[in-house]
Swiss-Prot record:
This is Vacuolar membrane protease. Residues 549-558 have a biased composition (Polar residues). It comes from Saccharomyces cerevisiae (strain YJM789) (Baker's yeast). Belongs to the peptidase M28 family. Residues 559-570 have a biased composition (Low complexity).
Length: 976
């Protein structure tokens, strides 16, 4: 009996037990979180157990070390070295294989000229034409069943000018090499194409060029490997539909990692990045975008190097892609369900998939059935007189306490915006923790103050029912969003799970009431908001509620003080006969026990049937009221808390560093943090008012620590730096001054850093900082001249870019006024791979340019061409982007045709000055090499000393990346 008493005491609904269960729940969630983030590091293949996988990993790691030895953007000579190394490795791997073929775009001189929407800004109305000379390396492995639709595996081998490209996208490239090596040994059933593509960083151009190759007709599916972060685990960033998500589920059995929340966030443009997957998807391919995604403040910086990644990260991407490609290559695929997918993994052990459309249907069923069942059970309990009526104050205290918590949270968020808006960049845990603890602490204080003055017998049950109503409203709203987005809001699934579990808990409570014992008469309100005698009695019992004397004896009708305190919520007998009797939730006294207490008024009425309850009936009642709360707790708290915590962590982990990219992103992250913390608090709010003083004291202490960290700690550190964008601009039309542009977030970060640079501190150099759009700040100053070329004479920067007009018939008397104007330009640019021409007319609202011709020069004189590529646009062309491979070819030969003003507006007017048909052409050419030297007059000098100075002297709390496709931009302008 003593053991039974101890067991029952441990499971009673009392403060200590509830607090302990909350501690256990959050401890388990924390351990699962750590397990999820660390487990992949322990799963490296061992040579004695998996020799083939171990060899693939070690070889891939060696390849990664070689290709990331230096910066290798498309605009650099190192880019060619990486291309040549990859080609050598591909030829080594394929060897004399009878089913392998290799195609090198550089050798075949493949180029494209096409009209392109800005891939990084879908809202842009800027009309762009791009010319690109490709050096993609393609490998075809002909399958045993070549009639099956083929699979493309793709990764890009270029980096940005400021990063070594270990994660972006070196690990993707070496994973492709490992996949190639594996499939050479294990011939696939379906044809595989490998695309080691170039120049993804500045236009997704390598992927675009793929569709100019005949092999593109063989492939229907794609696995794109990418890195939009700097290490960690490779996530299934997005996938085409439910069928492809299920293929991932069936194939990636070890360490699956994916969440459709990422997919929704990416498509909603909360992340200002893009991958080659966009191009493949737009061209009708279906597949998987597997990518590294964090941390963004190291992405595209010098810390995207092999020092900041690991074999564990490489193996996670390599093994994921290998499992997926091996499955797709060898199995027939069920691809019928093409609706968007909701998917997530459980700590890397299990992967779950459901169609977003199916989820919507289930939501509709939940929304329709749950209120019908709830209302039906309520009416039954009313009819059976087992429903206890409650005052309006009892019904409103939970929603009002929640509303008060949200209001206080909003006030606190205003303090964050005023004092430390970028705090999420350093550590999103502290602001989320502050929001979370503030909401639950506010609720605790308000509910307990209300209970002190106006005690309520059934607070937990009322709160659970009201939580059900709140979540029903939220689910209705999110289901509408899901439907209106054509089922593309795939990150809303956690709310469906939360609603389902909370509904079960609420229905169980209503079911217990409906099946409870019928009373002869209504027992009146249990939440006695008046009756001072009862209130004083209740207050005494509330004080006793925290005591834990397990040895206290019990008679057959009354329990110990802790027993009575444990009966707070579930006031329904589970017996098959006899009436239910009232139980005061927060005061621990039922009507049968009250008659033995001298504090109960002598004239107080009692139910005669209650007085006759048998010992067995009372025992059954105590069992139910002791343990039913545990079922409700286990339904509402652990699983929803874990899913919501994981969802908030997924969002913040991907977005917290985007606060550095503008004020809009800052407000987005703040809003996600606020809403996420409220959702995380909802599962425990129906119970939290009951925790003991130790728990609430720790909650208050955690809030104070979190709030202090959030408001007072500097947002940037060595490990979480502020990412700043650099470019050095030389405008030849305004002189040869080499103006340094440094772009970053507002907040007095940039200017103090720049003022401490030696070239500025010991000179009279002026720094001009101005606010630009979206909360960004641009600082400019005259920096040290770049040394882009090796020379034996004085470096003349004006010789870097020269523009020659070969032909222009604008003022020709032989041209009809209704005839388009034609001009030819020759750009002479030294050791260059990328230039941009922008067209503008001062007299026409839209660009009048309708046709562009690129003359491809091979071995002929600069004025001649072997091949021409022409593109036309009826809507006008604003910009021409040029990308060529040959550094020794120092010219771009361009033809431009534009409409005179007469053709665009039909207004024949005098043009005495002869300027109305003028076309302004702005030329910008880019150089991306900085970690190398030029030899000037026999002396080795750094190419971009202004950037070196920033790298060497800026605090470690800053990191640097390129603002444009080159670090040095030389500009000029002409009028045609």
């Amino acid at each position: 009996m003593k053991l039974k008493s101890v067991f029952r005491s441990v499971l009673k609904y009392r403060k200590t037990n509830l607090s302990l269960l909350l501690l256990i729940t959050y401890s388990i969630i924390t351990l699962l979180y750590i397990f999820d983030h660390e487990r992949y590091k322990l799963n490296l293949p061992k040579e004695d157990e998996h020799p083939e996988f171990n060899d693939l990993l070690e070889t891939a790691w060696g390849d990664l070390q070689i290709i990331t030895a230096s910066f290798h953007p498309y605009t650099s000579k190192e880019n060619d070295k990486v291309h040549d190394y990859l080609l050598k490795r591909v030829l080594e791997i394929t060897g004399n294989s009878s089913f392998a073929s290799v195609s090198d775009d550089k050798e075949s001189e493949r180029s494209i000229l096409f009209q392109q929407q800005d891939p990084f800004n879908e809202s842009s109305r800027f009309s762009r034409v791009t010319y690109f000379e490709s050096s993609n390396i393609l490998v075809k492995l002909e399958g045993k069943n070549p009639e099956e639709e083929g699979l493309l595996l793709s990764a890009h081998f270029d980096s940005v000018p400021t990063g070594y490209g270990a994660t972006d996208d070196g690990m993707g490239v070496v994973s492709l090499l490992a996949n190639l090596k594996y499939h050479i040994k294990h011939r696939p059933n379906r044809t595989l194409i490998f695309n080691f593509n170039n120049n993804e960083e500045f236009g997704l151009l390598g992927a675009s060029t793929y569709f100019n190759h005949s092999w593109s007709n063989l492939t229907k599916y794609v696995i794109n490997l990418e890195g939009t972060g700097a290490g960690g685990k490779a996530v299934l960033f997005r996938t085409s539909d439910t069928s492809t998500a299920k293929i991932y589920q069936q194939s990636v059995k070890e360490n699956p990692f994916g969440n459709s929340i990422y997919q929704q966030g990416f498509y909603s443009r909360y992340v200002r990045s893009e991958t080659d997957y966009k191009i493949y998807e737009e061209n009708g391919m279906r597949g998987w975008d597997v990518a590294f995604y964090k941390p963004r403040n190291l992405y595209h910086t010098i810390k995207d190097s092999i020092q900041y990644t690991s074999k564990a990260s490489l193996w996670h991407m390599l093994h994921t892609s290998l499992q997926l490609s091996a499955y797709v290559a060898s199995n027939s695929l069920d691809t019928a369900d093409q609706t968007p997918a909701c998917y997530f993994d459980f700590i890397g052990l299990k992967f779950f998939v459901i169609s977003a459309k199916t989820l919507f249907y289930w939501n509709c069923i939940f929304l329709l059935v749950s209120p019908v069942v709830a209302i039906g059970l309520y009416l039954i309990s009313r009819d059976r007189m087992t429903w206890k009526s409650h005052s309006w104050l009892s019904w409103t205290r939970f929603p009002l306490s929640l509303a008060a918590g949200i209001i206080v949270q909003k006030l606190f968020s205003n303090d964050i915006i005023r004092s430390n808006p970028l705090t999420f960049s350093r550590n999103y845990f502290w602001p989320i923790s502050a929001f979370f603890t503030q909401v639950i602490f506010t609720s605790y204080v308000l509910i307990n103050c209300s209970n002190f003055f106006f005690p309520c017998a059934d607070m937990k049950s009322l709160s659970i029912i009201e939580l059900f109503i709140i979540l029903w409203t939220i689910l209705l709203f999110t289901s509408k969003l899901l439907y209106s987005s054509d089922y593309r809001y795939t990150g809303l699934y956690p709310l469906s799970i939360f609603f389902l579990l909370s509904t079960i808990a609420a229905i169980l409570r209503l079911l217990a009431l409906a099946l409870g014992m019928r009373t002869r008469k209504r027992l009146g309100r249990e939440c006695r908001d008046h009756h001072s005698n009862y209130s004083s009695h209740s207050q005494i019992d509330m004080e006793r509620d925290g005591q834990e004397n397990l040895e206290q004896p019990q008679d057959q009708f009354t329990s110990s003080q802790d027993d009575q305190a444990s009966i707070q919520d579930d006031n329904v007998s589970t017996t098959s006969a006899g009436p239910s009797h009232n139980v005061d939730e927060d005061h621990g006294m039922d009507s049968s026990s009250q008659q033995h207490d001298e504090r109960v008024p002598l004239l107080k009425g009692s139910n005669s049937m209650e007085e006759g309850l048998s010992t067995r009936e009372n025992s059954l009642k105590l069992e139910y009221t002791d343990y039913a709360w545990i079922i409700q707790f286990l339904l509402i708290v652990p699983i929803p808390s874990f899913i919501l915590f994981n969802s908030v962590d997924v969002i913040m982990d991907a977005l917290n560093h985007t606060v550095q990219e503008g004020s809009k992103a800052t407000f987005d992250v703040l809003r996600f943090g606020m809403v996420g913390s409220i959702l995380m608090a909802l599962p425990i709010l129906p119970f939290f008012y009951k925790v003991n003083y130790i728990t609430i004291s720790l909650t208050a202490l955690l809030f104070l620590i979190s709030a202090s960290k959030t408001l007072l700690v500097h947002p940037f550190t060595n490990s979480n730096p502020l990412k700043v964008r650099f470019s050095q601009n030389i405008d030849l039309s305004q002189g040869n001054a080499a103006s340094v542009h440094v772009l970053g977030r507002e907040g007095n970060f940039l200017k103090p850093m720049l003022q401490d640079l030696p070239s500025i501190k010991y000179s009279s150099t002026h720094i001009n900082c101005t606010s630009v759009t979206n909360g960004m700040e641009l600082c400019m100053y005259d920096g040290m001249q770049p040394n882009l070329l090796s020379t034996n004479g004085n470096t003349n920067i004006s010789s870097m870019v020269k523009v020659h007009v070969l032909h222009n018939n604008r003022n020709s008397t032989e041209r009809s006024p209704y005839e388009p104007i034609v001009a030819e330009l020759l750009l002479e640019v030294k050791e260059n791979r990328a230039c941009t021409l922008t067209f503008e007319s001062r007299h026409q609202a839209k660009s009048p340019v309708r046709e562009i011709t690129v003359y491809q020069k091979k071995n002929s004189a600069p004025q001649k061409a072997n091949i021409t590529k022409t593109i036309k646009s009826a809507s006008g062309i604003n910009e021409l982007q040029l990308h060529k491979l040959d550094f020794d070819q120092e010219t771009y030969h361009i033809g431009v045709q534009w409409f005179p003003k007469l053709l665009t507006d039909g207004n024949l007017e005098d043009d005495k000055l002869g300027t109305k048909d003028e076309l302004s052409v702005s030329i910008s050419c880019y150089w991306g090499e900085y970690d190398s030297e030029s030899v000037v007059n026999g002396t080795a000098v750094r190419k971009i000393p202004a950037f070196d100075e920033l790298i060497n002297y800026a605090p470690l709390s800053f990191s640097f990346t390129n603002e444009q496709k080159g670090l040095v931009i030389v500009k000029d302008a002409i009028i045609l």
